[in-house]
Structures are given as C-alpha cells and as structure tokens.
Amino acid sequence: MLKLLILKRIFLDYIFDGFKQALFLLFNADESVISAIKTTLLSSSISIVLALLIGFPLGFILGFFEFKLKRFIKLIVDTSLSFPTVAVGLILYALISSRGPLGEFGLLFTIKALILGQFILALPIVIALFSNLIENMNKKHFLLIKSFHLSPLKLVLTMIYELRFALISVVALAYGRIVAEVGVAMIVGGNIKYDTRTITTAISLETNKGEFASGIALALVLILIAFCLNFITHKLKRT
C-alpha cells in the first residue's frame, strides 16, 4: 500500500512538474514552440481554404446532378474519409520525391508539401459532407431555389448560404482533422525545426526525446485550438 502511494506521488509530481514547465515555455514564448504553432496555423489555414474552394463545387456536382459514375465516385470519396494518413503520406512522398513524377518541383520537405498533404486529407471530407447535405436538402426548399433559374455559380453560392449552419460543422471537422494529423506532416514535411515542424510532429518528437514539458506545452495549444474552433462554431450557429 505504501509503495502504491509513493508511486502515485511520484507520478503526480511528474505530471505537475511537466505542466509547470509547459506553462513556463508558453508564457516565455519558447522559440521552437512558437515556430511549430505558426507552421501549423499557416499550413492548415491555407489547406482548408483550398479544400473549401475546390470541395464545395465538387460536392455540389456530386450531390445535385445524376450521372452514371455517381455511385462509384461517392464510394471512392467515402472510402478516402477513412484512408490512413500514413498511407496518404507515403503515396504523396512517392509522387514528390526526387524519383517521382513531381520530383522536379522540389516540394519534398517543404511547407508546400505540408499544405498539399493536408489539402488532400481535407478535400474528401468537404466533398462527402457537402454532397450529402445537398442530397438530403428539403425537396420543397430545393425546388424553390431551383425555380429562380440562377446561374451555376449563383446556385452553388445560394446552396452554401442556405446550408451555412451545417457547413460550419463541415469546416470545423475538416480543419480539426488536418490540425491533429501526424502521418502526412511527418513523411512529406520532414519535421524540420523552424520550417516544417508542426504541433503534432513536435509533440511526437519531444515525447520520444523525453522532453515531457515541451510535449505538454504543445498539447495544451492543440487543445486550445480545438476549444476555440468549437466555441466559434457554436457562436456562428447562434447568430
């Protein structure tokens, strides 16, 4: 019993010291921690914007129109939602490495590769969820919008506006996935300090090195991002 209490005390002290050092690193703006945060926010923000710009029109086409290969394409899109991020990273690595078809562009281990990988992860989520929203839209509401004989662009924008509250959740889900992923960022980004190191890859590295405080500091930031994302989502839905 005494041994158990001692082990419990040691564990709690270890956790407490880790949190204390983590807060010290955050409040003192540790350079490596801030760099990982900046890289994460920059790459994820650009990739989610690109995914929305391309995903909304493609999702609209998939949900609005009827064509021969629709079921097959939906199957591919839905399958890609659960595709392992490590596998995506490996495929992308093969494409952009020096021996790959896109090797001449020198994308490997750059912020551009990081953005491309996150974009590939976010795009199927946007397409799949938006197409489902279009298909499940109230038929009377749908026919009313269609009766206005709008141009294709205006029709897409009108649909987006009408489904804006549901789309907030789509954006939050897609953004949450790319911010929290490790596989693609590690493989094609290379986890280079002050360049392509993200919050998640930094947590993995620091924990493996035994730098528990740095890992906790970055984990706290990741939790804060998730909290802010959900807070903004709930606020927008109420407006």
Curated annotation (Swiss-Prot):
Pfam families: BPD_transp_1. InterPro entries: ABC_perm_TupB-like, MetI-like, MetI-like_sf, TupB. It is found in: Cell inner membrane. PROSITE patterns: ABC_TM1 (PS50928). The chain crosses the membrane at residues 45-65, 76-96, 114-134, 168-188, 212-232. Residues 37-233 form the ABC transmembrane type-1 domain. NCBIfam families: ABC_perm1, tung_perm_TupB. This is Tungstate uptake system permease protein TupB. It comes from Campylobacter jejuni subsp. jejuni serotype O:2 (strain ATCC 700819 / NCTC 11168).
